[in-house]
């Protein structure tokens, strides 16, 4: 059965299907939309008591529901200076060191950090010898993405690609999955060095958005596009730890890359398949004052 599912991933018109779902998800169909949301809540056992708007009728479209806000304070941010926090609700897929420009995907599969970052060689060099973490957001999860630490945006890259599903099954069987799919790469300058937040698209993910540029995709393209941003002055975009930086319309995956020696250890319990909750401790940071 797994082989059949993977074969279908290669055969399906994934971009066409995703854009069709996107149009349906954006439509405001009144009672029909409400019925679909109620079905989704029941099917995926979503805890709506955490949502700022807990009633399905409050959402005009499926997209409004997917990108729902949480109640204030429901995800308290760990404010300790030496702690990096989880950026999303989801589950850890993999994490570990970046060795020789390679990132571990699943047993038997690695992929290139250079390819992941849209073949931006200078960016890839900045993360050599550092660490990575891949977090999967299931359809049931909260779909907004937050900053793990404070950072100032320096660059954003749109990388065209496939739209394979990014669930654990495809991660085990599709080589180079996260470096093949359409993605948006945001690079931030932090006190610990560069931080890359890679928002990976997937089958029926209707769009990827950021708080500073709005919807990045759709429309999709065939070329890599890069935007550079000032890191000082009144136009600099600085986001605090725990502040929203983007969102998915439907679940997907976030890959984070960290500079060498930015992370001391991952927090207790942070390991593959561990459930993540935005704002909780993700990693213990190196003491930069004694780095010399």
Swiss-Prot record:
<keyword id="KW-0444">Lipid biosynthesis</keyword>
<dbReference type="InterPro" id="IPR003817">
    <property type="entry name" value="PS_Dcarbxylase"/>
</dbReference>
<dbReference type="InterPro" id="IPR033178">
    <property type="entry name" value="PSD_type1_pro"/>
</dbReference>
<feature type="active site" description="Charge relay system; for autoendoproteolytic cleavage activity">
    <location>
        <position position="252"/>
    </location>
</feature>
<protein>
    <recommendedName>
        <fullName>Phosphatidylserine decarboxylase proenzyme</fullName>
        <ecNumber>4.1.1.65</ecNumber>
    </recommendedName>
</protein>
<comment type="subunit">
    <text>Heterodimer of a large membrane-associated beta subunit and a small pyruvoyl-containing alpha subunit.</text>
</comment>
<feature type="site" description="Cleavage (non-hydrolytic); by autocatalysis">
    <location>
        <begin position="251"/>
        <end position="252"/>
    </location>
</feature>
<keyword id="KW-0865">Zymogen</keyword>
<comment type="pathway">
    <text>Phospholipid metabolism; phosphatidylethanolamine biosynthesis; phosphatidylethanolamine from CDP-diacylglycerol: step 2/2.</text>
</comment>
<feature type="active site" description="Charge relay system; for autoendoproteolytic cleavage activity">
    <location>
        <position position="146"/>
    </location>
</feature>
<keyword id="KW-0594">Phospholipid biosynthesis</keyword>
<feature type="modified residue" description="Pyruvic acid (Ser); by autocatalysis">
    <location>
        <position position="252"/>
    </location>
</feature>
<dbReference type="GO" id="GO:0005886">
    <property type="term" value="C:plasma membrane"/>
</dbReference>
<keyword id="KW-0443">Lipid metabolism</keyword>
<feature type="active site" description="Charge relay system; for autoendoproteolytic cleavage activity">
    <location>
        <position position="89"/>
    </location>
</feature>
<dbReference type="GO" id="GO:0006646">
    <property type="term" value="P:phosphatidylethanolamine biosynthetic process"/>
</dbReference>
<keyword id="KW-1003">Cell membrane</keyword>
<keyword id="KW-0210">Decarboxylase</keyword>
<keyword id="KW-0456">Lyase</keyword>
<keyword id="KW-0670">Pyruvate</keyword>
<keyword id="KW-1208">Phospholipid metabolism</keyword>
<feature type="active site" description="Schiff-base intermediate with substrate; via pyruvic acid; for decarboxylase activity">
    <location>
        <position position="252"/>
    </location>
</feature>
<comment type="similarity">
    <text>Belongs to the phosphatidylserine decarboxylase family. PSD-B subfamily. Prokaryotic type I sub-subfamily.</text>
</comment>
<keyword id="KW-0472">Membrane</keyword>
<comment type="function">
    <text>Catalyzes the formation of phosphatidylethanolamine (PtdEtn) from phosphatidylserine (PtdSer).</text>
</comment>
<dbReference type="GO" id="GO:0004609">
    <property type="term" value="F:phosphatidylserine decarboxylase activity"/>
</dbReference>
<dbReference type="InterPro" id="IPR033177">
    <property type="entry name" value="PSD-B"/>
</dbReference>
<dbReference type="Pfam" id="PF02666">
    <property type="entry name" value="PS_Dcarbxylase"/>
</dbReference>
């Amino acid at each position: 059965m797994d082989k059949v599912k993977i074969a279908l991933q290669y055969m399906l018109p994934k971009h066409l299907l995703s854009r069709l779902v996107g149009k349906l998800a954006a439509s405001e169909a009144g009672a029909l939309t409400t019925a679909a949301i109620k079905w989704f809540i029941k099917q995926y056992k979503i805890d709506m008591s955490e949502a700022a708007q807990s009633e399905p009728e409050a959402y005009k479209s499926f997209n409004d529901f997917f990108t729902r806000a949480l109640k204030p304070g429901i995800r308290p941010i760990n404010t300790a200076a030496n702690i990096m926090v989880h950026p999303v609700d989801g589950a850890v897929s993999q994490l570990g060191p970046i060795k020789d420009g390679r990132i571990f995907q699943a047993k038997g599969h690695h992929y290139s950090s250079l390819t992941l970052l849209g073949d931006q060689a200078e960016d890839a060099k900045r993360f050599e010898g550092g660490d990575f973490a891949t977090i999967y957001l299931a359809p049931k999860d909260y779909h907004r993405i937050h900053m793990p630490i404070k950072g100032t945006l320096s660059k954003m890259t749109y990388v065209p690609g496939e739209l394979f599903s990014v669930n654990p099954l495809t991660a085990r069987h599709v080589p180079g999955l996260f470096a093949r799919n359409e993605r948006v790469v945001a690079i931030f300058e932090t006190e610990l060095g560069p931080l890359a937040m890679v928002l990976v698209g997937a089958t029926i993910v209707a769009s990827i958005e950021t708080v500073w540029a709005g919807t990045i995709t759709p429309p999709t393209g065939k070329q890599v596009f890069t935007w550079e941003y000032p890191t000082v002055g009144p136009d600099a975009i600085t986001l605090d730890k725990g502040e929203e930086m983007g969102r998915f319309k439907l679940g997907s995956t976030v890959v984070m890359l960290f500079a060498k020696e930015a992370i001391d250890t991952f927090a207790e319990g942070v390991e593959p398949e561990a459930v993540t909750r935005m704002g909780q401790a993700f990693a213990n940071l190196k003491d930069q004052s004694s780095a010399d």
